[in-house]
Amino acid sequence: MNVSEELIREIVTKVLEESAGKGSKPEFEKHIDPSGIIGIKTSTVKCEPFQQDGVKLKDVVTLEEAPRMGCGIMELDHTSFECTLTYDEYDLVLDGTLEIEIDGRVVSGGPGDIIYIPKGSHIHFQTPNRTRYAYFVYPADWQ
């Protein structure tokens, strides 16, 4: 069998292109305009496990893309967790009910509601159901 150098080159190029395509598939739909404006389809974001059972999240912008503000999606599933915020945070509830407990009081939000939590707040994030919300934090390097 006589295999030409050109055929080998074509095969190698095709394999490399297919491999690169598999490895570079975006995790979710995000469009970055040359102006710096970013559009994200939140319904395509798949959250990953975070710190404890029933808590998942996914940062949707990098520090390079948005150096001053962070943004992501968090999912809570019939759970609660405690934390003290070292950043300012806005939460926009997408699905379910988000409850923020502070000093024995509860601030609650449903789909379309926004909750602001100031830096230094010692709170419990909790939910009686499965909740999905977008978070917006300042500064961007919140973890």
PLM-predicted stretches and their roles:
Residues 77, 101-105, 128:
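Short strand-coil-strand connectors
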Residues 55-85, 118-119, 141-142:
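Conserved short histidine dyad/triad with adjacent acidic residue
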Residues 1-6:
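Intrinsically disordered, low-complexity regulatory segments in eukaryotic proteins
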